[in-house]
Amino acid sequence: MVQRITIAPQGPEFSRFVMGYWRLMDWNMSARQLVSFIEEHLDLGVTTVDHADIYGGYQCEAAFGEALKLAPHLRERMEIVSKCGIATTAREENVIGHYITDRDHIIKSAEQSLINLATDHLDLLLIHRPDPLMDADEVADAFKHLHQSGKVRHFGVSNFTPAQFALLQSRLPFTLATNQVEISPVHQPLLLDGTLDQLQQLRVRPMAWSCLGGGRLFNDDYFQPLRDELAVVAEELNAGSIEQVVYAWVLRLPSQPLPIIGSGKIERVRAAVEAETLKMTRQQWFRIRKAALGYDVP
């Protein structure tokens, strides 16, 4: 059973692995098939699900909601995360992709997510990306309104720098619950730019997206040395796959990230969560780091 973890001093409690529904529309599941998939990952202990208003051309939330309408009892077994703040050209009114973080948009987006997801509350709402035009007071006002109305229980951000995180936190009477960021052997800037250090300082756990590098890990010739090293470490750890080793590498970070799994195949979800049992040494971790970057530590 997947470990549970309190991700910030004021909560919430999530499963250590998160089921990501970004590519739900690519899985070609019927609502009944999706119910079965949800039940299977809940039974593994993966109870936290990650959404965003824009996923699947603004369709993923509603598709998930149709499944919950067929099995509404599943809602009490899960924690739902969603995001807002990006506007894409998948909607006719948007002639250009842009960010929008004003008060009314955040409230309207959250309320639409509740309708789409067939639920009366979100466990966590994130601002999807930093907005150069973000007024922190407006965002805070929207968050406080949604919190007081009971529509959203916790709030956080995604892809924010430490300064952006601190700015928004300075306007809020409650703690931001997470910063959802890209963490992977093939994407390591956050290990040194202060993002994870800030979260560790605040005892806030990051959510980690694209742990497998969005396919680059498997398809990019540049990362062949990394694949080779992962295979060696997999053998040393008796791991079932190099994917498991990558998840173990992310889990080894002291900021205690929650990896987001993006596969609609339950066998891959099952394999991913087994990474919790792998005990990666410090030297194995640094070997993987070196293989990905191509150079040793200074």
Swiss-Prot record:
Keywords in alphabetical order, please.
NADP, Oxidoreductase
Q: Name one GO cellular component term.
A: cytosol
Q: What is this protein called?
A: Oxidoreductase YdhF
The similarity comment for this entry is:
Belongs to the aldo/keto reductase family. Aldo/keto reductase 2 subfamily.
One Pfam family assigned to this protein is Aldo_ket_red
Q: Which residues form the active site?
A: 55
CDD domains attached here? Answer: AKR_BsYcsN_EcYdhF-like
